[in-house]
Regions:
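Carbohydrate-binding surfaces of carbohydrate-active enzymes
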Residues: 34-39, 63-68, 75-262
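Substrate-binding/catalytic cleft of secreted carbohydrate-active enzymes
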Residues: 1-72
Length: 262
C-alpha cells in the first residue's frame, strides 16, 4: 500500500539478497527486516535445529553497518504451553511444532545467554563503539527429585456424555478447539480388514474393546491401519489428537480437527 513501510523476512545467508529485493520495492526506504531468523523452530520427529553462530553474527553485524533496522526473531526462546504449539504445512505435508520453542535463540528457553548472545553482543559493540554492560548472574537451576505417581484415572472411566451423530463430526462441529476427540462405533463380526481414515487431523490411537490396535499419524502421511478378525461384535474407538493448527497460508481454511473426511 502506498505510504506504508514494508519489511522483509529472512534467515542466515539471505540478508544481502533480501535487502536488494526490498530496495526494488521501496527504493526510498525505510530498510528493515521484520523477522531476522536467529535460529529455527522444531517439528516433532526432527533433530533440534541450530544455525552457525559465526555466520549469524557476521550477517547481523553487516546489517547494522549498513544502517538497516533489524527485528530479531527469536531473541528469547520460549515454550508453547498446552495445545498451542502450531504447525507448518505446504498443503500436502503436515509438520506439528514441538512444545519447546527454544529456537536456538540468543537467550535460550530458560532465559540463559548462549554463545550466540555473546557473538551478537560483540557485534553491536564493534558497530557502536560502546562497551556492553556486565551481564547479570546466571539464573540458578535446581534439580528436583523424582516424583512417584500416586494415583491415576482411566480415560474410559471419565468420558463426558457422548454426542450421537449419523455422520462424522469434527472438533469444531461440537464447539471444541483443542485437545482430543473420541469416535466410537460398534463393529460387526468379520474377517481381518483395514481401517482407512480420510482427512485425519492429526494423530489417532485406535482401540478395539479398549485394547490398543495401533496408531495413524498425519505427520507421516498415514491413513490406513490393519484390523484383526472380529469374532464377536466389538467396540471400535478412535482417539484423535489435535497436534497443532497450521496458522498461515490458505491451508488455514482446511484446518478443522478430528476426522475431517470419511
Amino acid at each position: 500500500l502506498p505510504g506504508l513501510p514494508a519489511v522483509i523476512n529472512f534467515g542466515t545467508g539471505d540478508a544481502k539478497q533480501g535487502f536488494e529485493t526490498l530496495k526494488k520495492l521501496r527504493p526510498d526506504g525505510p530498510f528493515m527486516t521484520g523477522e531476522y531468523w536467529a535460529g529455527w523452530f522444531d517439528h516433532w520427529g526432527e533433530h533440534h535445529h541450530t544455525t552457525a553462530v559465526a555466520a549469524n553474527a557476521a550477517e547481523y553485524e553487516w546489517m547494522l553497518q549498513q544502517g538497516y533496522s533489524v527485528s530479531m526473531y527469536m531473541f528469547h526462546g520460549g515454550t508453547s504451553f498446552g495445545f498451542m504449539s502450531g504447525a507448518n504445512s505446504n498443503g500436502t505435508n503436515y509438520e506439528p511444532d514441538t512444545t519447546s520453542y527454544n529456537y536456538d535463540a540468543p537467550l535460550n528457553e530458560s532465559g540463559q545467554p548462549t554463545p550466540k548472545f555473546t557473538a551478537f553482543r560483540d557485534a553491536i559493540a564493534r558497530v557502536t563503539g560502546k562497551t556492553p554492560e556486565a551481564l547479570p548472574q546466571p539464573i540458578p537451576a535446581q534439580t528436583y527429585p523424582i516424583a512417584a505417581r500416586a494415583e491415576s484415572a482411566s480415560l474410559w472411566n471419565n468420558l463426558p456424555a457422548p454426542v450421537e451423530s449419523d455422520k462424522l463430526l469434527t472438533m469444531e462441529d461440537i464447539d471444541q478447539a483443542y485437545g482430543y476427540i473420541l469416535y466410537r462405533t460398534r463393529v460387526a463380526n468379520g474377517a481381518a480388514g483395514e481401517l482407512v481414515i480420510d482427512g485425519l487431523h492429526d494423530y489417532a490411537q485406535v482401540y478395539m474393546d479398549r485394547k490398543l490396535i495401533g496408531t495413524i499419524d498425519r505427520r507421516l502421511g498415514q491413513s490406513r491401519l490393519a484390523l484383526p478378525p472380529i469374532l464377536n461384535k466389538a467396540t471400535l474407538d478412535i482417539l484423535v489428537e489435535n497436534s497443532g493448527r497450521v496458522n498461515f497460508t490458505n491451508v488455514i481454511r482446511t484446518e478443522r480437527k478430528g476426522i475431517t473426511g470419511s
